[in-house]
C-alpha cells in the first residue's frame, strides 16, 4: 500500500518493493543462488514479476548476447507488460558503455518497433572508460554496508547534479527510456530533459 501511494504521488512517482516482501519463497532461495554463483533462469524471470502494475507497465532490461532481445520481449509480453526496452548494457545492465557505440531495441506488444544504434557522444557524453570502476579499497571488504553507503552517496550526488561518470550513466539510461516511452522525439532532446531535471535538484526531491 505504501509503495502504491508513493507511485501515485506526482511529487515522488516511484517506489521500491523488496523481493522479501512481494515473493518471500523466491527470496528464500538467495543463499542457494549465492552458492551457485552463475546466473540461473531465475535471474531472467524474476524481473518479470512486476509487483506494482499500472494501466501501462513497461519493462527495461539489459542484455549481453545478441539472441536474447526477442526472447526477453516475448516473455515481457506474456507477463503483461505494455512494452519492453532491451539495452545492450555493460555486464548485462541497463547502462550502455559510456565510451563506445551500443544498441537498443524497442518492443511494443512483443513486436519489435525500433532497433537503434546509440552513441554516447551524440548525447554529450565523452568518457575514456566504458563504466565507473570498482574501487580497489572495496575489493576484499567484508562489510557490505560500507560499499552500499559508497554507492548511495555516489547516486545521491549524481541526482543532485554533480557531474561525473555516475551522472553520465543516469543521463544515458534515462534518455533511452524517455525516448522509448515517447516522452521525447530525439535522444539528444531527451538528454537535455534529463540533465535539466538532475541539475535542478528535482530528481532528488
How should each PLM-predicted stretch be described?
Residues 8-205:
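Glycine-rich anion-binding loops and their surrounding alpha/beta cores
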Residues 1-6:
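Glycine/threonine-rich beta-strand-loop-alpha-helix active-site module
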